């Protein structure tokens, strides 16, 4: 089993005035070896619990595809906190340890953040001595960067065009033996089942509203967000800053806000007045949810 090298990444969200220049930047680095060096922000600890795959319905026809899986983050999954989707503390956000970093082929430049996948070890594909029965459902919360210094079949597991899941260690060990390190898997998209409504965390400052969208059910992968303030009758589209952080340069301070969230399957849900008057930056609010 190859040695691990965890390399911290830096998230820089810079707000520049005038508002038209406001934008966010993120930088990522990765190490060598398999299943390691994921994009990661500084993290905090905690504990959470995932959901079983039997509660999830297939999406897009439910067909299975082939990939490989490794693991990272340690036995308590503390090393999976942060990540390129911007979710931060995966425990407090409700994602728990049922998470994975996706290779370029699956990550879709961040638009796959929040998508749910059912994954099972493929004993017939060469993992007969390492596989455990059953399957798990993981949420995409991070990016597994390519490592062009290593061959795709010997350490560069996330190199394009490979489909690869770098899973948290606890969830990997539910489908395969720890000593295996890497196993062939089958996977398919499934519907995400979440408790409560979609959550909107508003960061930034006046004229730079950075809205983190989490706990999204259904397809899970947010592709568009729009906001409507109490002083406007029109919806204003937000632009994706990074991960699932969406930004607006409008002056929204103190107003009641409604949000419209659209996922990759084209479905939308509206959370009317999810944010009440008098809100403050840094607060999180709950809205409607996909059925």
Swiss-Prot record:
Name of the protein described by the UniProt record: Expansin-A5
UniProt gene name: EXPA5
Functional summary from the UniProt entry: May cause loosening and extension of plant cell walls by disrupting non-covalent bonding between cellulose microfibrils and matrix glucans. No enzymatic activity has been found. May be required for rapid internodal elongation in deepwater rice during submergence.
Keywords, in A-Z order: Cell wall, Cell wall biogenesis/degradation, Disulfide bond, Membrane, Secreted, Signal
Lineage of the species this protein comes from: Eukaryota, Viridiplantae, Streptophyta, Embryophyta, Tracheophyta
Cellular component annotations (GO), alphabetically ordered: extracellular region; membrane
Subcellular locations according to the entry: Secreted, Cell wall; Membrane
Region (Disordered) location: 37-61
Organism: Oryza sativa subsp. japonica (Rice)
Family: Belongs to the expansin family. Expansin A subfamily.
Name of a matching Pfam family: Expansin_C
All copies of domain Expansin-like CBD, residue ranges: 207-287
Tissues where this protein is expressed: Expressed in panicles and flowers.
Signal sequence interval, chain numbering: 1-22
């Amino acid at each position: 089993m190859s040695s691990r090298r965890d390399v911290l990444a830096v998230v820089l969200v810079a707000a520049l005035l005038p508002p038209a220049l406001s934008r966010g930047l993120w930088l990522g680095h990765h190490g060598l070896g398999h299943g390691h060096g994921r994009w990661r922000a500084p993290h905090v600890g905690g504990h959470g619990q995932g959901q079983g795959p039997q509660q999830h319905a297939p999406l897009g026809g439910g067909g299975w595809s082939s990939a490989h899986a490794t693991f990272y983050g340690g036995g308590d999954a503390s090393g999976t906190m942060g990540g390129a989707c911007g979710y931060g503390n995966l425990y407090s956000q409700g994602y728990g340890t049922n998470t994975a970093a996706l290779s370029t082929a699956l990550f879709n430049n961040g638009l796959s953040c929040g998508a749910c996948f059912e994954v099972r070890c493929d004993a017939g594909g060469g993992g007969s001595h390492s596989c455990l029965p059953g399957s798990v459902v993981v949420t995409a919360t991070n990016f597994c960067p390519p490592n062009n210094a290593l061959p795709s079949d010997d350490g560069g597991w996330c190199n394009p065009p490979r489909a690869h899941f770098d899973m948290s260690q606890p969830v990997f060990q539910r489908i395969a033996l720890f000593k295996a390190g890497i196993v062939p898997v089958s996977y398919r998209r499934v519907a995400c089942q979440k408790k409560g409504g979609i959550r909107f965390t508003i960061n930034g400052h006046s004229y730079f509203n950075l809205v983190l969208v989490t706990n999204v059910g259904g397809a899970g992968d947010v592709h568009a967000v729009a906001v409507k303030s109490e002083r406007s009758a029109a919806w204003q589209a937000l632009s994706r800053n990074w991960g699932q952080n969406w930004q607006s340069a409008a002056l929204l301070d103190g107003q009641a806000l409604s949000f419209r969230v659209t996922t990759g399957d084209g479905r939308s849900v509206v959370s009317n007045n999810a944010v009440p008057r008098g809100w403050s930056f840094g607060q999180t609010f709950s809205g409607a949810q996909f059925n």
